[in-house]
C-alpha cells in the first residue's frame, strides 16, 4: 500500500491529473461560451 501511495504522489501523476482537469474545464467553458476572449465567469 505504501508503494501505491508513493506512486500516486509523484509529480508526473499529479501533473497528468491536473492538466487533464484543466483541459476538461477549458473545453467546457468554450462549449458554453464559444469564442470568448474574456471569460464571462469572472
Swiss-Prot record:
Main localization is plastid
Q: Which InterPro entries match?
A: PSI_PsaJ (IPR002615), PSI_PsaJ_sf (IPR036062)
Q: Which domain of life is it from?
A: Eukaryota
One GO biological process term is:
photosynthesis
What residues form the membrane-spanning segments?
7-27
Assigned GO CC terms: chloroplast thylakoid membrane; photosystem I
| Cellular compartments annotated | Plastid, Chloroplast thylakoid membrane
Keyword field = Chloroplast, Membrane, Photosynthesis, Photosystem I, Plastid, Thylakoid, Transmembrane, Transmembrane helix
What membrane topology does the annotation report for this chain?
Single-pass membrane protein
Q: Does the keyword Chloroplast apply?
A: yes
Q: Which family does it belong to?
A: Belongs to the PsaJ family.
Entry function: May help in the organization of the PsaE and PsaF subunits.
Which HAMAP family does this one have? PSI_PsaJ (MF_00522)
Q: Provide the protein name.
A: Photosystem I reaction center subunit IX
Originating species: Psilotum nudum (Whisk fern)
Amino acid at each position: 500500500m505504501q508503494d501505491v501511495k508513493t506512486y500516486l504522489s509523484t509529480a508526473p501523476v499529479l501533473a497528468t491529473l491536473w492538466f487533464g482537469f484543466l483541459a476538461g474545464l477549458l473545453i467546457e467553458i468554450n462549449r458554453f461560451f464559444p469564442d470568448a476572449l474574456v471569460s464571462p465567469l469572472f
